Amino acid sequence: MNTQTDDSAFIRACRRQPVPSVPVWYMRQAGRSLPEYRATRAGMAMLDACSHPELITEITLQPVRRYGVDAAILFSDIVLPLKAAGLDIDIRPGVGPQIDKPFRDDGDVAKLRDLEPGDVDFVSQAVGMLTAELGGTPLIGFAGGPFTLACYLVDGGPSKTFDQTRALMYGNPELWRLLLARLTAITITFLQVQVSAGASAVQLFDSWAGILSPEDYRRGVLPYSKQILAAIAASGVPSIHFGVGTGELLGLLGEAGADVVGVDWRVPLDEAVHRVAPGKALQGNLDPAVLLAPWPVIEERARDVVRKGRTAESHIFNLGHGVLPDTDPDVLARLTDLVHSVPTGSEGSAGSAGPAG
């Protein structure tokens, strides 16, 4: 836990405390949209790049230097802890995470051993290096949610609907519970390693949870998300919970226990505030594709997000998903400055402000 960042705008917003301006960071802010990222990672596989402390540190810092965002997010990948726990999984360029033999029975689940902190010592080293470099700028740790990890293991790779995963959840609930429990334990260890090394907050990405109905999410996923987020709460750092296409699940994402609920671009923030129980900050939610439009469109849409974010108890500006690879970095720099320039109007309320302009 890093107390040096407690008074930063990002951490204060996570805790629904007053801030002078809306804090900003971007999912996938360290990624293919940056020329320096492409140069740093040239010729290196993703999971290899995520295993070198110096490389993790450099890539994580790149968007902080370029954009002046209010938080860094650790450069890693959601399947990294699975690889570290001994699973033969890889990220294939242009495809995504792949496993040669998808999980179907108890024997497959038995391949997943517990994750030991020493398995990801390179992550601890990188976090230590980053917190020394970042000073008062918070570092966000992260992990994939257990449902999303299960999707890759059961379907064997990316899919739009993850039919095999849902079929397993419906048809073999005992095996499903065994798999999710194992993934939950791995995720908790991975996040605790990051927090112990100095991460100021964490984000749980359950990227594919939006393919589930609310009732299926409540039965098959929510108990495990609650367990992870309770473990993080006990460590004393704030947490963010996000998934794509989760408009119908926003209330349940909040119920899972995070301090901040991430909202994708499909649900306006002034609508999301009614779907999430009181006591939560909201994060989001500019459509990433808007950044490919002319600047007047970007400015109008960004100001609208800030305006609607004022209806929440607290708001962290972000995109509704990750930065697209062909996004112009200069546009992100300009967007960051724009959001920072809009005053909240009163430091007595994290979620109120004057006109957006």
Task: Annotate the PLM regions.
Residues 6-10, 36, 108, 164, ...:
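Exposed alpha-helical structural elements
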Residues 52, 102-105, 161, 294:
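Intrinsic-disorder/low-complexity, polar/charged segments
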Residues 87-100, 152-163:
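Short, flexible, mixed-charge acidic loops at enzyme active sites
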Residues 119-348, 355-357:
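Active-site loop segments of alpha/beta catalytic cores
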Residues 1-93, 329-347, 357:
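N-terminal basic, low-complexity leaders that serve as flexible interaction/assembly modules and, when applicable
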Residues 38-50, 105-116, 254:
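Short, basic, glycine/proline-bearing loop/turn elements
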Residues 78-81, 96-97, 105-106, 146-148:
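A short acidic, glycine/proline-enriched capping/turn motif at secondary-structure boundaries
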Residues 94-132:
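A gly/proline- and charged-residue-enriched helix-loop-helix capping module
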